[in-house]
Amino acid sequence: MMIPAWRPDKAMNIEAPEFASYVHQLEQVSGVTITKFADMVDALKKRHDFFQANGCKLSDHGIEEFYDEEYTDSQIETIFEKAMRGQQLSNLEIRQYKNCFLTVMAEMDADADWTQQFHYGAIRNNNTKMLNQLGPDTGFDSIGEFNTAKAMAKFLNKLNMEDKLTRTILYTLNPCANEVIATMLGNFQGGEPGKIQFGSGWWFNDQKDGMERQMNALSVLGLLSRFVGMLTDSRSFLSYPRHEYFRRILCNMLGNDVEKGLLPDDRELLGRMVEDISYNNARRYFKFY
């Protein structure tokens, strides 16, 4: 089964030179004339509905970090208008806008009963010379270091207080934050098993050591048996074998713990757990069928 996912990063990255041109493209595809931020939200809602009509059940947001800067509706409208005129935005304005944008998208996902994903912790396009020569996403990104725990907690808490915190998966690119996320999950669980998930190791951590570190942190501080397991980009179809790679690493970890006497030597119990992590948990969690 192949279904689309919702990735509205271009609407979030208000500081990008191509932001205004993207908004004009959004106007064309949505049929909504966009002169203010509220108009863009209306246009995105139409596209959100279109994605849902075509089977979409997940959103994904690529962010450097979480944001907690306070804002008002009038401030966001002013920031949006400045960006559309090509005016320079301050760092505070960018962060206010992104906080507002992610909140609006999260509320939209909650209303649609989607799962939201946040991939955070990358610093991108570090080599300007190569960016100018080859463009973005050509191999000049790296792991970032951000003090984001408080902002993450504040963001999730705000949604939770509004009853707008849908199923959420948090992915960190920096393994130093593994324990941060593993402990953050417990603050906002409720309503359904494993509602808030620690996402599998991704990008630079999408290898044996990275996968083991992520799963070890989750098993020590959370509940590994509720884990929804591995993921991959559908656009990178040749990377699908990483699911088999992941399953072998998972089984090896559990087998080693059995040999050390840390887990019961119960093939039925552990076999069912592996099946759940490999397939059943994700099927139930994402409500595919």
Question: Can you name each region flagged by the protein language model?
Answer:
Residues L224-R226, R242-Y289:
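Mid-to-C-terminal alpha-helical segments outside catalytic/metal-binding sites
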Residues E107, D111-D113, E162, P175-P193:
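C-terminal functional module detector
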